[in-house]
Amino acid sequence: MASVLDGLRKKLNKAYEDKGIEGDVFHIGVSEDKFKSTFSLGSPSLDMLTYNSIPEGIFIEVVGPESSGKTTLAFKIASDFIKKEKQKPKEERRHIMFVDAEGTADPYWAKVSSGYDMNDTGIETLYETPLGASAEEILTDVATAVQTGKIGLVIFDSLVSIAPKQVNGESMEKKDMGGVAKLMSDFVRRNTGLFHRYRTTFIGINGIYYSVDGYGNPERTSGGTAWKRACSLRLKTKRGPCYDKDGKELKDTDPGAIGHIIEVALLKTKFCRWDRKLGRCHLDYTRGFDILQDTIDVATFFGIIQNVSQGHYIVTDPDSGEPISEKIKGKANIKPFFEEHLDVWKRVYDKVYEMMSRKDNPNDVSFEKMLNINVEELFGINFEQEAEENG
């Protein structure tokens, strides 16, 4: 039976078609599949922040101080995007655009840290080094690339490194961040529909600078309020403690570090509950993101791995809850167990993702509560103030 609004829908879609816009703009009702096409932040701990429900076609901001893991996190997202796209038929695969405004993206570190091959021939990276180009030109390049329908992920590194044409030739004293804010405001207003139509995700990496005016939060970011409000997801990264080969956290002065923890705060989300605010992932300097260790942390959170007696752990069957391992002495020895039983790890990993995606469990306790961590104190942020600024 035809909808009473069907005639109106066809008429409105025809008007857009006459303007050269392909595809239906108007629909009757909203498809339940609208947000089923999601992508990963690359770590079970980080995906848990968002209930593993990040939709494609949105604006994301990753902000943080120097060396806090912003670009490395973007590399990991790109790596997982490639894996997902390669599962599609060749004619449906989309590619990556990487805008290296800083000119510092290292393909070797991208591959070591995250598995992101910037020279992959199956899912290619359109790499732009716009050194000397104005912000207007760079953002126009991005929109032009997205309009082809061939780009599924844009990584922009970073917003703080671009300058509008108006101030590009000015002296350093005259440059300010206001021009970038106006440009980003125009960019998101004009192109939100474009990114949504082609399901292209835009990741804007942003640095922090400090205001000395004495009012409010001294931390400032480029892009302005409109950019913040256009973002459906905002993450703040922080370099956490180093750890040794046994996973023991170290002080900065301690020897024997093989990696460090990247701590991530969820500043804003538009698509899931905002009750999980802290994620922690392990970055091994020679092996990259340690997904095994992150799986252990989240599986412990969900009770799949249980501390049964004073530092002795057991791994339980993800479905039945029955023990499937002997007592393992020390949490550091769970990882070798998984390395020897990768089939068990994969079952635990899959179950972890199933459990983290449930949005209706009132008994869930966030990582920060379980670990007794004050996220506002750790990151120096005020979530109430962030909510007001994010819109």
Name each model feature, range by range:
Residues 1-28, 242-391:
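C-terminal regions of RecA-like/P-loop NTPase motor modules
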Residues 2-123, 147:
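The Walker A/P-loop phosphate-binding site
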Residues 3, 7, 41, 57, ...:
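Charged, alpha-helix-enriched surfaces in structured cytosolic catalytic cores
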Residues 11, 15-18, 49-53, 65, ...:
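Conserved, well-folded catalytic cores of nucleic-acid-processing
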Residues 60, 152-156, 200-202:
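Generic beta-sheet signal
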Residues 81-177, 181-186, 190:
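Conserved inter-motif catalytic segment of the P-loop NTP-binding fold
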Residues 145, 177-302:
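Phosphate-binding/switch region of NTP-binding enzymes
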Residues 167, 210-214, 310-312:
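N-terminal cationic and glycine-rich segments that engage phosphates or anionic surfaces
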